[in-house]
């Protein structure tokens, strides 16, 4: 990853560009993905317990950032009818929002008006309450309903779902519900946390917390493979997924019984256009540092190069049939061995 700093490692992978100090450079991959057609979805870009960046793209592609289910309910639950403007007032407000006077044109040089109007449109959609119905995770939903299916897939107790909606599985369930109901085209999820185990808590906490996160990812993939879209095809057939961390932990145990930050890490990519069931690259047997590889074969090659975040971005986007111009100035190298022919 080229860094041992949490913020730098996270933002480097989110955008595919090395940060400017601690500040992200460029836009998140999910924002580029949503920018393909931001007007098509109610929530083009859903961001759950992680970061998101938009540098110069359509403001509608910016993520709806939430920490968890409680935030989602706050944003999407319908307004109190007593607080909604009367018809005449609502009409007048809309006319003001979309007026095209000289002031609006001057302000929009920096896209402020465009961004404000995009937010206004989303506020209208969210305030009506129709989107909330997809996330109204009630107790004991009707058998066979989408909510009941999500509970079963992610191991959520239907009798008391609220105790688990803040877990890794709960966050993955929210992502699955958004994607399979046509509400969004890009979701970023902070699946696991509490992994910065420098002390002897490593032995107990690292395994259980990673297992919870990986189980959520596995259940998500399984659910997408088993759930059909309106055309009768699995959602997984047109989906891509990437799982990463800020960096890895050192192979050696430190003097406190934990593991420190490590410069090399791994990443999971899967889905549309990706040739799975393989490991690309390897680490050295002596110090476990990453070895340079031939990107066309995935095999170690002293004349090759290390895999970098922009290479991962480019490969995943290429597999999905999308442009990877977002990292074109990073000289990305496609991992040809990871792409379906």
Predicted regions and their residues:
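A contiguous, mid-domain pocket- or channel-lining segment that forms the substrate-recognition surface
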Residues: 2-134
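Surface-exposed intrinsically disordered loops and tails
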Residues: 16, 20, 56-62, 148, ...
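Hydrophobic/aromatic-lined pockets within catalytic cores
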Residues: 34, 38, 77-80, 179-180, ...
